[in-house]
Amino acid sequence: MLKGQIISGEFGKIIARQKAGESIEIGELLVADSSEGKILLQVYDLVYGSQISQQNLEMISGMKLEENTEFELFDANLRNYMLAMMKSLVMVKGKNAFVSKSLPGFFSEIREIKENDLGFLTKPKNPLFVGNLRSGSKILDVPIYLDGGKVFSHHILIAGTTGR
C-alpha cells in the first residue's frame, strides 16, 4: 500500500510527504523500491507541513477560535499534510541485506513493509525466539530469533522504547 513520497532530506534524515488518507506512525517500517533493490526505512519523527504561511495559519485559527468563522480551504489535501522523518536501515538485494550507503531516489514512492521484503531474516541453528517484528503499533507475522549459542555466552542489551 502506497504511504507517501520522498521529497527531500539527507543521509539519516529522509523526508517523505504522507499520502492523503493514509496513516504513518513513529517506528513504522517502510520500503522504497529502487533499481538496486529495496531500501528499508524507519520513521522516527512526524511533523506538519503546509503550503499556507505560518502567519495565515495563525489568522485562520484565530478566526475559527475567536469568531467561530468557518473556512473552506481549496484543495485542503494538497495544502496541508504530514511529513515523515525517516532513517535508512538496510538495502535489501534478493535474500541479502547490506548496510545502506545511498539515498532513495528523489520522489521515490514509499510503501508499507510486507513479509516478503524480509527474506533476509533467517532462523539460526540454535534459535532463541525473542518475539515478532513490530512496525509502528502493528505486530507483523515475522518471528525474530537470536542464535542461542551466542546469546548465552555474551552480554546482550536489547533496547526499545515504549509509551509512544
Describe every region a protein language model picked out.
Residues 1-159:
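Basic- and hydrophobic-enriched, low-structure N-terminal and domain-boundary segments
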Residues 162-164:
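ATP-binding Walker
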